[in-house]
């Protein structure tokens, strides 16, 4: 790789590392091309970029970013998954993929500048996603309003039922 191409990769990765919320390092040795493509597709669905970058270039790109804490794990072949928004989605995909593919191994992760252990990544994968949490919160906010509307609608409904019963009583 030429020096210009390397510097372009470093600047591109530095930009992505600075803007991402979480980064996951994994050892991909032993995976087939089909398995890597499957993983890329699953990660793309949750808005995550998955790349293989040389360790030296990744080390240079991570300097001065939150992901600098991952430098100690940059040994051997590594792939990096970058999550710009919700870190729970990629954690779920990567831990599930690691369970089903023994050759794939998560090495480390970084979340907003904090180095996460593999156990912490697994715990993160157990959390509900941002969308699920927002749905639950909106449901909680909406429930009292819905109940209040139901109570307000019950008054005219029971009044109509009473009138219908009186009418039936007079007819029958």
Swiss-Prot record:
Q: Which CDD domains match?
A: Ribosomal_L10
Q: Does the keyword Signal apply?
A: no
User: What InterPro entries does its record include?
Assistant: Ribosomal_uL10, Ribosomal_uL10-like_sf, Ribosomal_uL10_bac, Ribosomal_uL10_bac_type, Ribosomal_uL10_CS_bac
Q: Which residues form a coiled coil?
A: none
Keyword terms of this UniProt record = Ribonucleoprotein, Ribosomal protein, RNA-binding, rRNA-binding
**Listed GO CC annotations:** large ribosomal subunit
A Gene Ontology biological process noted in the UniProt record is: translation
Q: Which domain of life, per UniProt?
A: Bacteria
Q: How does it assemble?
A: Part of the ribosomal stalk of the 50S ribosomal subunit. The N-terminus interacts with L11 and the large rRNA to form the base of the stalk. The C-terminus forms an elongated spine to which L12 dimers bind in a sequential fashion forming a multimeric L10(L12)X complex.
NCBIfam families, per database record: PRK00099.1-1
Tell me the protein's name.
Large ribosomal subunit protein uL10
Task: Name its species.
Answer: Syntrophotalea carbinolica (strain DSM 2380 / NBRC 103641 / GraBd1) (Pelobacter carbinolicus)
